[in-house]
Every structure is written in C-alpha cells, then in structure tokens.
Amino acid sequence: MDVMKQLSLIGIVPVIAINDAADAVPLAQALIDGGLPCAEVTFRTAAAADAIKNMVDAFPEMVVGAGTVLTCEQVDRAVAAGAKFIVSPGLNPTTVKHCQEIGVPVCPGTANPSDIEVALSLGL
C-alpha cells in the first residue's frame, strides 16, 4: 500500500524529537501498542537518522518518516536510514524535486497562496 494512503488510514502522525537513538525502539513499541504504527522523527537532533534506523530495523511494518528536513543531504540521510516519507517546514523546490527523483513522498510546508502555487507546479 502507498505510504500516503497508509498515513491517511492511520489518521494521525506523532511528531517526535529523539535526543538519544537508544530511546527510539521503546518509543516505537509504545506507539504501536497505542495503535499508532507511524512516526515522524524530526531532524532537529543529531540522533535523528540513527533513531529512524533503529525504529525501522525493530519494526519494519511501522511507517517512519523524517521531519524538519531542510536539505537534499538530510533527505539522503533519512532515506538511507529507512525513512518512508519526508516532511519539511517550508517549500524548497530543490528538496522537493530531489525527493521526487528518488521516489520518496514529500510533504512540504506552505504558508501562503504563492507557496501553494509552487507546490502545485511541482506536481504536489
């Protein structure tokens, strides 16, 4: 099933910041036990990529993505760690195009009608 469809069916995506990658698996287990088999791990900490990898390795069925992604390099690190989707706080056409080129769903933030028009022009 398509990642965006999975997230739509789950209905809510917990956004988490993990400072210690060792905390990722117990947190993922708690989310799954609570009926939320998904998470957006923010790239605001140095542990983000390792946390994503730990969660995906322990629970391959979990839909884990990366949030607060600002650059193509962060996209690559997140995807290499196992992220199944990317969220960014703003609309950076370079980052969006990179996600599209490598086949990872991306949800950029939009703040005004111009952002929406750019997103539409990018096929989002």
Would you name each region that the model predicts?
Residues A47, L70-E73, V79-L124:
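Conserved anion-binding
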Residues M1-K84, E101:
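Conserved N-terminal beta1-alpha1 strand-loop-helix module at the mouth
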